[in-house]
Amino acid sequence: MLHLIIADSELELVPKELQNHPSIISHAKRRFKKPEEILLDSTYHHTALKSLKDGERRGRPDIVHLCLINALESILNKEGKLRVYVHTRNNEVIYIKPETRLPRNYNRFVGLMESLFKNRVIPKDLALLRIENKTLSEIIGDIGPDAVFIMHENGVLMSPQSFGRKLNEYISPAVIVGGFPHGDFLSVLEGEKISIYKEPLMAWSVVNEVLINYEGSLLW
């Protein structure tokens, strides 16, 4: 069983210090919602983000969307060999049941995440998605993996195929992929840092390479 954690993800509701910004208010009105009820999104809120010291990396729910679509539609997940978690910059964790079918449409995904932040579980009878306050280290402690690997551009360089074989040496490894556009992890991490390419890759590309090559080693 592989545990995939999208960590320090830039997935959050509009923070209090930005809720009165004109671009936030305008976007919220167009969606018939309050500013505090909408996701922070750099596509619409880039002028507001300029006022934050780390604004260049925030407001990227699209990264989480692409990572989750790729992971949940993977052969590994369909074979019951994958568990996926989303950890956010605000130390929240989203638990996702393997049978969950997320919206392919980005705007519908945004609406789903906004509902999840508000209601904490979706739907209430099935709990396909639920969110809890938890740090990354607490998530790792709950999972109890027999190995932890951190995908990092400064990690030990190995081919995706070699990393897939390495993962297969363990019963329940965890792989941590950053859910942010650039920069480093915000959380303190313990584990082996791995790089699968000579240049930085986007998070969803890393997810694809890890899952496909683990599948190749485990299933075929």
From Swiss-Prot:
InterPro entries, A to Z: Alpha/beta_knot_MTases, Rbsml_bgen_MeTrfase_EMG1/NEP1, Ribosome_NEP1_arc, tRNA_m1G_MTases_N
Catalytic activities: a pseudouridine in rRNA + S-adenosyl-L-methionine = an N(1)-methylpseudouridine in rRNA + S-adenosyl-L-homocysteine + H(+)
Known EC number: 2.1.1.-
Keywords tagged on the record: Methyltransferase, Ribosome biogenesis, RNA-binding, rRNA processing, rRNA-binding, S-adenosyl-L-methionine, Transferase
A biological process term (GO) from this entry: rRNA base methylation
Residues of the site described as Interaction with substrate rRNA: 60, 101, 104, 108
Positions marked as site (Stabilizes Arg-60): 62
Residues reported in the UniProt entry to bind S-adenosyl-L-methionine: 178, 183, 196-201
PANTHER family in the cross-refs: NEP1/MRA1, RIBOSOMAL RNA SMALL SUBUNIT METHYLTRANSFERASE NEP1
Function of the protein: Methyltransferase involved in ribosomal biogenesis. Specifically catalyzes the N1-methylation of the pseudouridine corresponding to position 914 in M.jannaschii 16S rRNA.
Family the entry assigns: Belongs to the class IV-like SAM-binding methyltransferase superfamily. RNA methyltransferase NEP1 family.
Subunit field text: Homodimer.
Protein name according to UniProt: Ribosomal RNA small subunit methyltransferase Nep1
Species, as recorded: Thermococcus sibiricus (strain DSM 12597 / MM 739)
